[in-house]
Amino acid sequence: MGLFGKTQEKPPKELVNEWSLKIRKEMRVVDRQIRDIQREEEKVKRSVKDAAKKGQKDVCIVLAKEMIRSRKAVSKLYASKAHMNSVLMGMKNQLAVLRVAGSLQKSTEVMKAMQSLVKIPEIQATMRELSKEMMKAGIIEEMLEDTFESMDDQEEMEEEAEMEIDRILFEITAGALGKAPSKVTDALPEPEPPGAMAASEDEEEEEEALEAMQSRLATLRS
């Protein structure tokens, strides 16, 4: 570290351009991930409406928690995009410095952004590879592994669930519900066609459908 070009096989300008291309590619991956999670969330919303109409309080709560997890995952992905934009700006600055000084320089901004990006599971492998290349080039210093960030996630999740369930149910049902119901008698938005409620689904099938939905969301967030 510090000796620019010590083990470099490519010119600095070529390295910076390659890093920028990889970052943009990962941004597209993140965009797809966000869209997939949001599409699945729409399905969850419809399931919450159905469960509310049937007075299935436990199902409403489980699905609301899934939505909280999904929205939290989407927020983290948007944050990762912001960090990637910071790295891209840093790469532009490196090219400007390279033209003047003839070598790459250390960047605290890039360092901070990369420290955050290597913790994002969806892009972790690529970001670790990039960080190693940037360390060799002297742009960033060696980063320590930080594995403690998500230790309190479960506890925070429970607290958030208690606070957010009512709000989410109110939001999904356009105000027809303010909290998880014990029995719903009020008309909800987008009512079922006549006769649809008469044929209630088998309980086991509903459980399987719920588990399948949870599994899909967990896969998208992983």
Swiss-Prot record:
<dbReference type="GO" id="GO:0016236">
    <property type="term" value="P:macroautophagy"/>
</dbReference>
<keyword id="KW-0472">Membrane</keyword>
<dbReference type="GO" id="GO:0001778">
    <property type="term" value="P:plasma membrane repair"/>
</dbReference>
<feature type="region of interest" description="Disordered">
    <location>
        <begin position="180"/>
        <end position="222"/>
    </location>
</feature>
<dbReference type="GO" id="GO:0140678">
    <property type="term" value="F:molecular function inhibitor activity"/>
</dbReference>
<dbReference type="GO" id="GO:0030496">
    <property type="term" value="C:midbody"/>
</dbReference>
<feature type="region of interest" description="Intramolecular interaction with N-terminus">
    <location>
        <begin position="151"/>
        <end position="220"/>
    </location>
</feature>
<feature type="region of interest" description="Intramolecular interaction with C-terminus">
    <location>
        <begin position="2"/>
        <end position="113"/>
    </location>
</feature>
<dbReference type="GO" id="GO:0039702">
    <property type="term" value="P:viral budding via host ESCRT complex"/>
</dbReference>
<dbReference type="GO" id="GO:0005770">
    <property type="term" value="C:late endosome"/>
</dbReference>
<dbReference type="GO" id="GO:0005546">
    <property type="term" value="F:phosphatidylinositol-4,5-bisphosphate binding"/>
</dbReference>
<protein>
    <recommendedName>
        <fullName>Charged multivesicular body protein 3</fullName>
    </recommendedName>
</protein>
<dbReference type="GO" id="GO:0000421">
    <property type="term" value="C:autophagosome membrane"/>
</dbReference>
<keyword id="KW-0653">Protein transport</keyword>
<dbReference type="GO" id="GO:0045324">
    <property type="term" value="P:late endosome to vacuole transport"/>
</dbReference>
<dbReference type="GO" id="GO:0044790">
    <property type="term" value="P:suppression of viral release by host"/>
</dbReference>
<feature type="coiled-coil region">
    <location>
        <begin position="141"/>
        <end position="222"/>
    </location>
</feature>
<dbReference type="GO" id="GO:1901673">
    <property type="term" value="P:regulation of mitotic spindle assembly"/>
</dbReference>
<feature type="region of interest" description="Interaction with VPS4A">
    <location>
        <begin position="151"/>
        <end position="222"/>
    </location>
</feature>
<dbReference type="GO" id="GO:0006915">
    <property type="term" value="P:apoptotic process"/>
</dbReference>
<dbReference type="GO" id="GO:0031410">
    <property type="term" value="C:cytoplasmic vesicle"/>
</dbReference>
<keyword id="KW-0832">Ubl conjugation</keyword>
<dbReference type="GO" id="GO:0051258">
    <property type="term" value="P:protein polymerization"/>
</dbReference>
<dbReference type="GO" id="GO:2000641">
    <property type="term" value="P:regulation of early endosome to late endosome transport"/>
</dbReference>
<dbReference type="GO" id="GO:0005769">
    <property type="term" value="C:early endosome"/>
</dbReference>
<feature type="modified residue" description="Phosphoserine">
    <location>
        <position position="200"/>
    </location>
</feature>
<dbReference type="GO" id="GO:0090148">
    <property type="term" value="P:membrane fission"/>
</dbReference>
<dbReference type="GO" id="GO:1904930">
    <property type="term" value="C:amphisome membrane"/>
</dbReference>
<dbReference type="GO" id="GO:0042802">
    <property type="term" value="F:identical protein binding"/>
</dbReference>
<dbReference type="GO" id="GO:0032509">
    <property type="term" value="P:endosome transport via multivesicular body sorting pathway"/>
</dbReference>
<keyword id="KW-0963">Cytoplasm</keyword>
<feature type="region of interest" description="Important for autoinhibitory function">
    <location>
        <begin position="168"/>
        <end position="169"/>
    </location>
</feature>
<comment type="similarity">
    <text>Belongs to the SNF7 family.</text>
</comment>
<dbReference type="GO" id="GO:0005829">
    <property type="term" value="C:cytosol"/>
</dbReference>
<dbReference type="GO" id="GO:0015031">
    <property type="term" value="P:protein transport"/>
</dbReference>
<dbReference type="GO" id="GO:0006997">
    <property type="term" value="P:nucleus organization"/>
</dbReference>
<dbReference type="GO" id="GO:0032467">
    <property type="term" value="P:positive regulation of cytokinesis"/>
</dbReference>
<dbReference type="GO" id="GO:0000815">
    <property type="term" value="C:ESCRT III complex"/>
</dbReference>
<feature type="lipid moiety-binding region" description="N-myristoyl glycine">
    <location>
        <position position="2"/>
    </location>
</feature>
<feature type="region of interest" description="Important for autoinhibitory function">
    <location>
        <begin position="59"/>
        <end position="64"/>
    </location>
</feature>
<comment type="function">
    <text>Probable core component of the endosomal sorting required for transport complex III (ESCRT-III) which is involved in multivesicular bodies (MVBs) formation and sorting of endosomal cargo proteins into MVBs. MVBs contain intraluminal vesicles (ILVs) that are generated by invagination and scission from the limiting membrane of the endosome and mostly are delivered to lysosomes enabling degradation of membrane proteins, such as stimulated growth factor receptors, lysosomal enzymes and lipids. The MVB pathway appears to require the sequential function of ESCRT-O, -I,-II and -III complexes.</text>
</comment>
<dbReference type="GO" id="GO:0046761">
    <property type="term" value="P:viral budding from plasma membrane"/>
</dbReference>
